[in-house]
Amino acid sequence: GYIGNTHNKAKINKLKAGTAYVIKITALNSSGIAISSRTVGCTTLYSKVKIKSSYASTGRYTFNMQTVNPSNSITGYKVVYQSSAAHKLITKYFNTRYSFTIPISGNTFYQVKIYPYLVLGNKRYVSSTSTDRYISNVITLQKAGNTNSSMSVKWNRTAGADNYSIYIKYPGSSSFKKVKTTTSNFFTLTGMKKNTKYGIKVIANKKMKNKVWHSDSKAYNMSLV
């Protein structure tokens, strides 16, 4: 395309997000004859980004972002998050394209909004479209008693959770099976055999619109001696 301009700057509209362009700038004299020319590359900001993977660790949560092409269409990420316990918005800027970590505390869901941004000159341009996630740390289980054939566990409630799913790995099985979804923070596994290990993990669930979000999980072993 061609843009006629007598000023020292021009605005090009209707470009695609996250796309590299080559722009040729030509200076013309009063007769319309080219007297100099320069070609420059530019890129537009991605409107939205994707998360490659994410995980919780002690006191923090890490997001690994999917690589964009061209990579220089993103400088970093603006991250806005709040916990279901405090309801206080926190905003952080991360000058990285690949991975970032936010601090979190246990026993609460967090709403996380991730916006890509691009720095041109001294100005930061932030996308108006966010990638949204609801995250929560792992649930820590505590033994709450046992009989000759059963064992009970309990856990602290997670702020913002609607319910909890209990998964058991029975002896001889290589995978966990969901056995119950409950609003309680207490569970008893019955029919246990002595000197036999059972796997258990509890996951907090939060429903938002048509999607259910889950906390991270940690597997524990249970056994009756």
What are these regions (language model features)?
Residues 59-72, 149-160:
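Conserved aromatic anchor
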Residues 27-29, 57, 67, 81-83, ...:
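Residue-level signal for short segments within beta-strands and strand-turn junctions
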Residues 46-54, 135-144:
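Proline-enriched interdomain boundary motifs that mark the N-terminal boundary
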Residues 21, 72-77, 110, 162-165, ...:
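Short beta-strand/loop motifs in extracellular/secreted proteins, especially
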Residues 1-16, 78-106, 165-193, 207-212:
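Recognizes extended acidic, P/S/T-rich segments that occur
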Residues 17, 30-47, 120-137, 207-225:
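Extracellular fibronectin type III
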Residues 12-32, 103-123, 189-210:
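Beta-strand-rich modules
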Residues 57-59, 120, 147, 183:
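Structural motif
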